[in-house]
Curated annotation (Swiss-Prot):
Subunit structure: F-type ATPases have 2 components, CF(1) - the catalytic core - and CF(0) - the membrane proton channel. CF(1) has five subunits: alpha(3), beta(3), gamma(1), delta(1), epsilon(1). CF(0) has three main subunits: a, b and c.
Family: Belongs to the ATPase gamma chain family.
Gene this protein is translated from: atpG
GO-annotated molecular function: ATP binding; proton-transporting ATP synthase activity, rotational mechanism
Pfam family membership, one: ATP-synt
Gene source species: Acaryochloris marina (strain MBIC 11017)
Upper classification of the organism: Bacteria, Bacillati, Cyanobacteriota, Cyanophyceae, Acaryochloridales
Name of the featured protein: ATP synthase gamma chain
InterPro entries: ATP_synth_F1_ATPase_gsu, ATP_synth_F1_gsu, ATP_synth_F1_gsu_CS
Keywords: ATP synthesis, CF(1), Hydrogen ion transport, Ion transport, Membrane, Thylakoid, Transport
One GO term describing the cellular component: plasma membrane-derived thylakoid membrane
Subcellular location: Cellular thylakoid membrane
NCBIfam families, per the entry: ATPsyn_F1gamma, PRK05621.1-2
Function: Produces ATP from ADP in the presence of a proton gradient across the membrane. The gamma chain is believed to be important in regulating ATPase activity and the flow of protons through the CF(0) complex.
Topology class, membrane: Peripheral membrane protein
Length: 317
């Protein structure tokens, strides 16, 4: 028969663990809200920038535009930018991105194409360093809610590698936020930039974390973008439109990278919230099972004591 004290100790331990997981769930939920606010705050600038780039591209569509960030080169070496988190306790968030990065590197290796990594997040850094993979740069200890400065530092490194022709292609591997319980690691080409893809993008969505019936839920709102308008043919530029486009493309790259970092952060926080919610549910179930075992053990102990008393009384008679 299990010892009553050991069962009580286990129940107490599980209850304390549940308090921790519940607190972590609430913290992650609050940070998911902040991540959403960041995405929403940067959207007007991103939309307007895309509109301007579209107008410039349409204005220059009949001209020979030779800009380094737009030129396709023979594919000899690819830079893989991998974005993970710094901490665990977030389900399969980190392992899914790392697995996708390994799959992509194996695909390149099978084609005889060289590759190198730029790693964001301690989990990716630790994983690929242990496996002696080629690494150009690492970025660990970033803010949980990514900032424009952090995105700019990473973008500068990528631009340096690409413009110096150390790499011919830059691909981003990050986690796209789909829902509170669902996210997907994706591969996206960052460099060279595709002018047509600047505005031919998938429809945007905003996610909002809400509470309903005491449970967290995600509401999604589809954001309709306005139809891009070409600039008037008689518009006069103080600078050459090609020079303006050349100056705006790095800014667009920074914005794309910031958005990817924000989505990755939101995915990590949502995964951690879900993991802690599941842990809390499992703790509640375990507490119920242990309480039942405790009551059975106590009942058995009482029954045993009664039998001993009755047996002693009968022996005296």
């Amino acid at each position: 028969m299990p010892n009553l004290k050991s069962i009580r100790d286990r129940i107490s331990t599980v209850k304390n663990t549940k308090k921790i997981t519940e607190a972590m769930r609430l913290v992650a939920a609050a940070k998911v809200r902040r991540a959403q606010e960041q995405v929403t705050a940067t959207r007007p600038f991103a939309d307007r920038l895309a509109q301007v780039l579209y107008g410039l591209q349409a204005r220059l569509k009949f001209e020979e535009v030779e800009l380094p960030l737009l030129q396709e080169r023979a594919l000899r070496k690819v830079c893989l930018l991998v974005v993970t988190g710094d901490r665990g306790l977030c389900g399969a968030y980190n392992s899914s991105v790392i697995k996708r990065a390994e799959e992509r590197s194996n695909e390149l290796k099978a084609k005889g194409i060289d590759y190198t990594f730029v790693l964001v997040g301690r989990k990716a850094i630790q994983y690929f360093q242990r496996r002696d993979q080629p690494i150009e740069a690492t970025y660990g200890g970033l803010e949980q809610i990514p900032t424009a400065q952090e995105a700019s530092e990473i973008a500068d490194e990528l631009l340096s590698l690409y413009l110096s022709e150390e790499v011919d292609h830059v691909e981003l591997i990050y986690t796209r936020f789909i829902s509170l319980v669902n996210s997907r690691p994706v591969v996206q080409t960052l460099l060279p930039l595709d002018p047509d893809a600047l505005v031919v993008a998938e429809e945007d969505e905003v996610f909002r974390l809400t509470t309903r019936g005491g449970q967290f839920q995600v509401e999604r709102e589809r954001m309709e973008r306005g139809t891009p308008q070409e600039m008037p043919s008689d518009m006069i530029f103080e600078q050459n439109p090609i020079q303006i486009l050349d100056a705006l493309l790095p800014l667009y790259l920074n914005n794309q990278l910031l958005r990817a970092l924000q989505e990755s952060a939101a995915s990590e926080l949502a995964a951690r919230m879900t993991a802690m919610n599941n842990a809390s549910d499992n703790a509640s179930e375990l507490i119920g099972t242990l309480t039942l075992s405790y009551n059975k053990a106590r009942q058995a102990a009482i029954t045993q004591e009664l039998l001993e008393v009755v047996g002693g009384a009968e022996a005296l008679n």
